[in-house]
Amino acid sequence: EWRDEQKHMANPLDDLRIKAIRPLVPSACLIEDAPADAEVYDTVSSTRTALSKAVRGEDDRIVVIVGPTATHECKATMEFARKLSAMAESLKADLIVVMRVGMGPHGDWAGMIFDPDLNGSIKINKGLLQARQLLIDINRLGLPVACEYIDTISPQF
């Protein structure tokens, strides 16, 4: 009777507990859908240079990485980013402020990239686009971001 239930499958041992398989959008397509502009590239580039100098001791400013452990609400995250950006600007002579944006799993939640709708639907393509757009929007404020990636796929997007 077990074999009768599995006749529709090419190999009755493959994917026994898989409900659906959906393709992952290629990173090139996502980058095209949410392009970063020159302002974003300037923020990233100048911050990398400043951080490199700070690590080498050529810049005496203190590096501060601050932000939410788990980001799931873009509107609230942008509100925090705007306030932090203003504060970072006023303290830029003494501090290099980088906003932490945690989009990976936290506690029992899969994270923004894997569960952008907060309902267990696992819409990874939507999450990747939403996460990329959020990072772009924060960088457009002139506020650099730091992310902790827990897989080898997410950084490509």
Language model feature labels by segment:
Residues 43-61, 76-90, 97:
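Generic N-terminal targeting/processing segments that precede catalytic cores or assembly contacts
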Residues 36-43, 72-76, 122-130:
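Catalytic cores of large soluble enzymes that bind and process phosphate-bearing ligands
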Residues 8-14, 81-82, 87-89, 93-157:
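Active-site-facing alpha/beta catalytic cores
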Residues 1-8:
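Short, Lys/Arg-enriched N-terminal segments with co-localized hydrophobic residues
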Residues 10, 15-58:
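N- or domain-start disorder-to-order transition segments that initiate the globular core
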Residues 67:
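Conserved, mostly hydrophobic/aromatic
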